[in-house]
Amino acid sequence: MKYDIAIIGGGPAGYTAAERAAAGGLKTVIFEKKAMGGVCLNEGCIPTKTLLYSAKLLDNAKGAAKYGIAVPDGISFNLEKIIDRKDKVVKKLTGGVKQTVKSYGAELIEKEAVITGEDNGLIQILAGGEKYEVTYLLVCTGSDTVIPPIKGLSEIDYWTSKEALEMAALPKSCLLYTSPSPRDRSLS
């Protein structure tokens, strides 16, 4: 199958590029091996903000009495339902991204794309057993979690942000380790 442009990666950069390319009249294909929407939609911005909203509602309910609002004693939460709501929000938005990309006329291939070479000026890509030939290639692979090389870390049970978003129960305690942003590092 021949295309004018292929985009590898279905995060914000990739799906926006696919929409714009297709809207501009280019025969467009976009490949995503995990989940459309990238880290922001699936493991970052959206799910964390959805969980944060539930936490804010709980906090507001606990402090409602000082505003003259009576609430029952023993306000509690159901973590399973909170996680389920987060999953539904992510699923809805992921579906919206897929539909939008397709509505512009881009073809979405939910398989890993492998660049196999070039032939007669066309870039060769293999995905899901199918061959694709493209004139232009845009690689938008996004980001992934980096596990720091801390001695002994592999000997303990630890979570990355991905596991934290899927927790089945709250831990009794935890230690958060984050790295500074590149901007913060340049200030030191």
Q: Which role fits each region the language model picked out?
A:
Residues 10-11, 33, 179:
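Glycine-rich Rossmann-fold phosphate-binding loop(s) that bind the pyrophosphate
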Residues 14:
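N-terminal Rossmann-fold NAD(P) dinucleotide-binding loop
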Residues 2-3, 19-26, 31-170:
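Glycine-rich flavin
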Residues 177-184:
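Conserved small/polar residues in nucleotide/adenosyl-binding loops
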Residues 1-10, 172-176:
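Beta1/beta-strand and adjacent pyrophosphate-binding region of the FAD-binding site
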